[in-house]
Amino acid sequence: MEKLASEGKTTEEALEKLLKTNNVSLGQILYSKEFKKGGLLKSDVTLITAYYKKELLEKAQEFLNNLIKGLNLEAKFEILNKEERSVIKIYSTDNSVLIGKNGLTIRALEILARQYIFSNYDVNFKFYIDVENYREKRDKRIIRLAKQTAKEVLKTKVSATLDSMTSYERRLVHSALSDFQGIKTHSEGTEPNRYTIIEVE
């Protein structure tokens, strides 16, 4: 695992140095920063430590593979590393076990893998995990449901409340309907039972 480091008087200066020295873009890395107080003859400095997203995803994959082997399952992995969204796709000998009811096991695996990366590399990496494209298909269903519900709300002028969803799923709904003319959305409730309301403007 390659570790990149730089320092500067400000975060911006330290980060700019790191990107230039290593010929990388901000979208390729994740970094943490530490403020170091200067002494009598030294200025304050900001220390930047960074890792490549691709290598962090590979470490997360290793962690997940060991976890899945502990369940007596075999798995293959596919890493999609894009600047806007990073996904680790899993294809196992028993996908239903890894998916769980309503995708709860996928979510648990995701939390564990993210925590592993944070604990070992001190970066908050919000990558996602999918099993046999379950999440991709569910995302499409949620977007389709949101749009169908919005059309019904426009027609009847009666607000609609969707079932409770994760924060990621609620963001999908808000995003899908952000340009839907005459409709507005907001979320209510407390986790893990927070839900989205679709209503006319």
Question: Language-model segments: which ranges?
Answer:
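RNA-contacting regions in translation and RNA-metabolism proteins
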Residues: 1-201
